[in-house]
Amino acid sequence: MLEAKNILVGITGGIAAYKTVFLVRLLKKAGANVKVVLTQNASTFVSPLTLATLSENPVGIDFTEISEGSLSWNNHVELGLWADYMIIAPATAHTLSKMANGQADNLLLVTYLSAKCPVLIAPAMDLDMFKHPSTKTNLNTLSKNGHAIIPVGNGLLASGLSGEGRMAEPEEILEFLINYHKIFSYI
């Protein structure tokens, strides 16, 4: 279903980032071409090397990187144009706020603002953060902007609390993307 589709995965700095490693693997198994952009904070939760290996592409973290002894520029516009779909998973409350307000202070956010493709967002945060009116406002804004919000799960959270806020499981995100693609590829 996703054969030769270009999927750009954006990973933000939340504990649920570990799930996104498996999502990258599932996307590749489904036949997609995958590129990954991490926030600096996300790189403390998941290894860029692991993601580069699984995606079979270099991972973007910053606007510039040192590769093979020279400095190269990560072109966010090219990344945004390359993608058929962009999935941001996990999307923390911090990043949701920045996205809803058009802030562009890291590679992931400037790529998001440059993307011409559908954007799918998988929120992940603690129960109280998820239920906060500011978070609901940001999610509503992003939804009104045409982005697909992947429903959060309900269960045990990293904080020890139980409730809404868990990032959807990788299989659920893949299924959401496939269904989204089926619906909107005919329009």
Question: Can you say where each PLM-predicted feature lies in the sequence?
Answer:
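A cross-family phosphate/adenosyl-ligand binding-site feature
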Residues: 1-120, 127-187
